[in-house]
Amino acid sequence: MATYDSDTGLVRVVQSKERFTMARIESRNIDSPDETRRFQAHGHADVVTIGDFTLGRGTFEPGWKWSNDVKPVAGTDSCQVRHTGVCVSGQMTVRADDGTEVSVGPGDVFVMEPGHDAWVDGDEPCVLFDTGMAPYAKATG
């Protein structure tokens, strides 16, 4: 606790027995990732983890399709990862196991629940920032 003495102009600090937690601020650059996960072909994911927060930047090249490029690594019939993020360039179509399709493009914020396939549309790479990358494109078992 601090008190100000207006007569002397001094601040008196009294140490308390209470515990205080200092706020922590940490910054990392995605261009120096902790890990780069290469897909079977057609791209990769750069992954940075700070504490319990993980962010990935997925670069999906033309011709990329989850069922061709990640399924062999994941070992599941469809992607079982929940993705939340934003598309910054390119276009990707996502098809849920129930047949629902949604396309995302630059500026689109998305939530993709587990149980989907996806592919790049067009001849431009699709770049996504995704908070669901901690388990993505990692071998199961």
Could you tell me what each predicted segment is?
Residues 3-59, 67:
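A short, N-terminal "cap"/entry segment at the start of jelly-roll beta-barrel domains
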Residues 31, 62-64, 133-141:
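Glyoxalase I/VOC metalloenzyme domain signal
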Residues 57-78:
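Conserved short histidine dyad/triad with adjacent acidic residue
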Residues 58-60, 85, 110:
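Conserved GNAT-family N-acetyltransferase fold
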Residues 65-66, 90-95, 118:
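Short beta-strand segments in beta-sandwich/barrel cores
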Residues 76-94:
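Short, conserved beta-strand element in jelly-roll/cupin
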Residues 97-115:
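Short acidic-glycine-tyrosine-enriched beta hairpin
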Residues 113-138:
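Ligand-binding loop in jelly-roll beta-barrel domains
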